[in-house]
Curated annotation (Swiss-Prot):
SUPFAM superfamilies: Radical SAM enzymes. The gene is lipA. Its EC number is 2.8.1.8. SMART domains: Elp3. Transmembrane segments: none annotated. Pathway: Protein modification; protein lipoylation via endogenous pathway; protein N(6)-(lipoyl)lysine from octanoyl-[acyl-carrier-protein]: step 2/2. Belongs to the radical SAM superfamily. Lipoyl synthase family. Residues 72-290 form the Radical SAM core domain. CDD domains: Radical_SAM. This is Lipoyl synthase. Its cofactor is [4Fe-4S] cluster. It is an enzyme of class 2 (transferase). The lineage of its organism: Bacteria, Thermotogati, Deinococcota, Deinococci, Deinococcales.
Length: 331
């Protein structure tokens, strides 16, 4: 009898029509370079306390990010807006899938802004689940959160890693005009692997068109995208993806190793060595990106603040207003 590939099984059903993926992590042998330390420390504990007290969701927890210990111990976190239930079911993602039925926490923008103040953050990354159940995909809520942060913390830089909003450029503009400093939308993988890696409603070309629109509409805003490696892509496909991103006006590109969250997700096809990640970065920099961050444990928001911080006086003219030098150092 042939056994079914666990990655093809449907997520488990739980109450209220919400589907939850198996929360038991995969126990697979990984290369030495993928080992991380267990999260500890006073700052890590304080950040976790603030997140819990304000009923916030972080992508650090929901997506089982391997950098949670390092980032939280630095006193920074990526906030995940609009709940922890995503309307899409990408086969790489550990976030729960279901129908949030239009529910939103209207106090969330203020709660996030207050948390940023309490944590004394100088650079904040906001992301969210996909909310196809909302007419605007959550764009207004996203923009409201950015504005709330800027009102309470006017010097704080804000990066918005948004859904594709179904390609609705009016929704993209709503976020762009909220005061955001960096606009990101993740390509996730190369063209050939977009399906089955991403939800069927996601599109390689749509993501590129959203990023291109963002750069055309607001040249002063940094544009950014991220890809996972180890899903079966070839080096030539990676080069093609980099060229596509550059043609769309993307400023910053990140590459990281795909890690399988549970047995319900796609398996890892290959572990890419740190040396190969370095080679990919060099190829990307030769294409003219502002920065290419490439490494096994890199995620789209990993050390995002340093992209600007490490370049005092060296930003292109259209981004020179973001030159904050050492002022962007986190607590």
């Amino acid at each position: 009898m042939t056994q079914q590939d666990p990655s093809t099984k449907e997520p488990k059903f739980i109450k209220n029509g919400i589907y939850r993926k198996d929360s038991v992590p995969v126990r697979e042998k990984k290369p030495e370079w993928l080992k991380v330390t267990i999260p500890t420390g006073q700052v890590f504990t304080e950040v976790r306390k603030i997140v819990k007290e304000h009923r916030l969701h972080t992508v650090c927890e929901e997506a089982m990010c391997p950098n949670i210990g390092e980032c939280w111990s630095r006193g920074t976190a990526t906030f995940m807006l609009m709940g922890h239930i995503c309307t899409r079911a990408c086969r790489f993602c550990a976030v729960d899938t279901g129908n949030p039925m239009g529910k939103l926490d209207l106090d969330e923008p203020r709660s996030v802004a207050d948390s940023v103040r309490l944590m004394d953050l100088k650079y904040v990354v906001l992301t969210s689940v996909d909310r196809d159940d909302l007419p605007d995909g959550g764009a207004y809520h996203f923009a409201k959160t950015v504005k709330a942060i800027k009102e309470v913390n006017p010097q704080t830089r804000v990066e918005a890693l948004t859904p594709d909003f179904g390609g609705n450029t009016a929704c993209v503009d709503l976020v762009l005009d909220s005061g955001v400093d960096t606009y990101a939308q993740n390509l996730e993988t190369v063209r050939r692997l977009t399906h089955p890696v991403r939800d069927i409603r996601a599109s390689y070309d749509r993501t590129l068109s959203v990023l291109a629109h963002a750069k055309q509409a607001r040249p002063d805003v940094i544009t950014k995208t991220s890809l996972m490696l180890g899903l079966g892509e070839t080096r030539e496909e990676i080069r093609e993806a980099m060229a596509d991103c550059r043609a769309a006006g993307v400023d910053v590109l990140t590459f990281g190793q795909y890690l399988r969250p549970t047995m319900h997700h796609l398996p890892v096809e290959r572990y890419i060595s740190p040396a190969e990640f370095d080679e990919i970065r060099e190829e990307g920099m030769q294409l003219g990106f502002l920065e290419v961050v490439s490494g096994p444990l890199v995620r789209s928001s990993y050390k995002a603040e340093q992209i600007v911080m490490d370049r005092p006086g060296n930003l292109p003219e259209h981004l020179s207003h973001l030159d904050g030098g050492s002022e962007l150092t986190l607590i």
